[in-house]
Amino acid sequence: MAWSLGSWLGGCLLVSALGMVPPPENVRMNSVNFKNILQWESPAFAKGNLTFTAQYLSYRIFQDKCMNTTLTECDFSSLSKYGDHTLRVRAEFADEHSDWVNITFCPVDDTIIGPPGMQVEVLADSLHMRFLAPKIENEYETWTMKNVYNSWTYNVQYWKNGTDEKFQITPQYDFEVLRNLEPWTTYCVQVRGFLPDRNKAGEWSEPVCEQTTHDETVPSWMVAVILMASVFMVCLALLGCFALLWCVYKKTKYAFSPRNSLPQHLKEFLGHPHHNTLLFFSFPLSDENDVFDKLSVIAEDSESGKQNPGDSCSLGTPPGQGPQS
């Protein structure tokens, strides 16, 4: 160990003495949701400030990505998500430069899955959760990590606030419901992306804590009773309205159209239909040439109608004629 430290110090002193530019240190790729940032650390250099150039291999030719930058990072998010990529960086000072430092990077395998978004809604004694897959850098707004990995699922863990016991579930869809929780209790929930075929898990989201309430849902049997009672009351009300309208109709009809009563003898006559038939056929059919005179029957006064009993049977002698001998 002491020999290695001595060799490193000796190398640094030799580089400083000869004026050689040291290479960048701790070169690494920081990739989250395909936002690929190549990072490094600037080495100690006595002559002045260093600049850096970063390149990537494309069709067997290295292409510049960042040139003469004073930053210690370079954005490679435009690289294809699939396949291996060779990247390299070097330090530069004036016309001098260090050796290249190479790394190999495969975005689809090496990128870190960031925390998903989550929306939590409390409904009585349950928590309704909706998950949002992380978005991808330099892609359409609707393009998410779920579109890249076919086996994408979620890991959800929840616990009572203030306790250490955690429960985990694996939803297959973008939503999940935690039911039958204790009422008036605060629960905390976290979610992360998970790839079963790669056995790769993403980063946990920040905990979201919500308090449940009491289940005030009306039982189904009570709903049925209320519905039946409502139907009965409606039918009863309709029946009452119909009876009231019928009474009003009858009263109005009698008030504006009083009933005309027939004589008793006409009622009896019309009550026997066979009498009507006999009366109809008792009269002979009239001829078209028959002439009818109008006959009026006038009742005689009672005073003038009085006669002697003997007069009713005697025949008068016409004037001017005497008895025959």
UniProtKB/Swiss-Prot annotation:
<feature type="topological domain" description="Extracellular">
    <location>
        <begin position="20"/>
        <end position="220"/>
    </location>
</feature>
<dbReference type="InterPro" id="IPR015373">
    <property type="entry name" value="Interferon/interleukin_rcp_dom"/>
</dbReference>
<keyword id="KW-1133">Transmembrane helix</keyword>
<dbReference type="GO" id="GO:0006954">
    <property type="term" value="P:inflammatory response"/>
</dbReference>
<comment type="subunit">
    <text>Heterodimer with IFNLR1.</text>
</comment>
<dbReference type="InterPro" id="IPR013783">
    <property type="entry name" value="Ig-like_fold"/>
</dbReference>
<keyword id="KW-0677">Repeat</keyword>
<feature type="domain" description="Fibronectin type-III 1">
    <location>
        <begin position="23"/>
        <end position="111"/>
    </location>
</feature>
<dbReference type="GO" id="GO:0038023">
    <property type="term" value="F:signaling receptor activity"/>
</dbReference>
<feature type="glycosylation site" description="N-linked (GlcNAc...) asparagine">
    <location>
        <position position="68"/>
    </location>
</feature>
<keyword id="KW-0675">Receptor</keyword>
<dbReference type="GO" id="GO:0032002">
    <property type="term" value="C:interleukin-28 receptor complex"/>
</dbReference>
<dbReference type="GO" id="GO:0038196">
    <property type="term" value="P:type III interferon-mediated signaling pathway"/>
</dbReference>
<keyword id="KW-0812">Transmembrane</keyword>
<dbReference type="GO" id="GO:0140105">
    <property type="term" value="P:interleukin-10-mediated signaling pathway"/>
</dbReference>
<dbReference type="InterPro" id="IPR036116">
    <property type="entry name" value="FN3_sf"/>
</dbReference>
<dbReference type="GO" id="GO:0046427">
    <property type="term" value="P:positive regulation of receptor signaling pathway via JAK-STAT"/>
</dbReference>
<dbReference type="GO" id="GO:0005886">
    <property type="term" value="C:plasma membrane"/>
</dbReference>
<dbReference type="Pfam" id="PF09294">
    <property type="entry name" value="Interfer-bind"/>
</dbReference>
<dbReference type="GO" id="GO:0004920">
    <property type="term" value="F:interleukin-10 receptor activity"/>
</dbReference>
<dbReference type="GO" id="GO:0098586">
    <property type="term" value="P:cellular response to virus"/>
</dbReference>
<feature type="compositionally biased region" description="Polar residues">
    <location>
        <begin position="305"/>
        <end position="315"/>
    </location>
</feature>
<comment type="function">
    <text>Shared cell surface receptor required for the activation of five class 2 cytokines: IL10, IL22, IL26, IL28, and IFNL1. The IFNLR1/IL10RB dimer is a receptor for the cytokine ligands IFNL2 and IFNL3 and mediates their antiviral activity. The ligand/receptor complex stimulate the activation of the JAK/STAT signaling pathway leading to the expression of IFN-stimulated genes (ISG), which contribute to the antiviral state.</text>
</comment>
<feature type="signal peptide">
    <location>
        <begin position="1"/>
        <end position="19"/>
    </location>
</feature>
<dbReference type="GO" id="GO:0019221">
    <property type="term" value="P:cytokine-mediated signaling pathway"/>
</dbReference>
<dbReference type="GO" id="GO:0051607">
    <property type="term" value="P:defense response to virus"/>
</dbReference>
<dbReference type="GO" id="GO:0007165">
    <property type="term" value="P:signal transduction"/>
</dbReference>
<protein>
    <recommendedName>
        <fullName>Interleukin-10 receptor subunit beta</fullName>
    </recommendedName>
</protein>
<dbReference type="Pfam" id="PF01108">
    <property type="entry name" value="Tissue_fac"/>
</dbReference>
<feature type="domain" description="Fibronectin type-III 2">
    <location>
        <begin position="114"/>
        <end position="216"/>
    </location>
</feature>
<feature type="glycosylation site" description="N-linked (GlcNAc...) asparagine">
    <location>
        <position position="49"/>
    </location>
</feature>
<feature type="glycosylation site" description="N-linked (GlcNAc...) asparagine">
    <location>
        <position position="102"/>
    </location>
</feature>
<feature type="disulfide bond">
    <location>
        <begin position="66"/>
        <end position="74"/>
    </location>
</feature>
<keyword id="KW-1015">Disulfide bond</keyword>
<dbReference type="GO" id="GO:0016020">
    <property type="term" value="C:membrane"/>
</dbReference>
<dbReference type="GO" id="GO:1901857">
    <property type="term" value="P:positive regulation of cellular respiration"/>
</dbReference>
<dbReference type="GO" id="GO:0006955">
    <property type="term" value="P:immune response"/>
</dbReference>
<dbReference type="InterPro" id="IPR003961">
    <property type="entry name" value="FN3_dom"/>
</dbReference>
<keyword id="KW-0472">Membrane</keyword>
<dbReference type="GO" id="GO:0015026">
    <property type="term" value="F:coreceptor activity"/>
</dbReference>
<dbReference type="InterPro" id="IPR050650">
    <property type="entry name" value="Type-II_Cytokine-TF_Rcpt"/>
</dbReference>
<feature type="region of interest" description="Disordered">
    <location>
        <begin position="301"/>
        <end position="325"/>
    </location>
</feature>
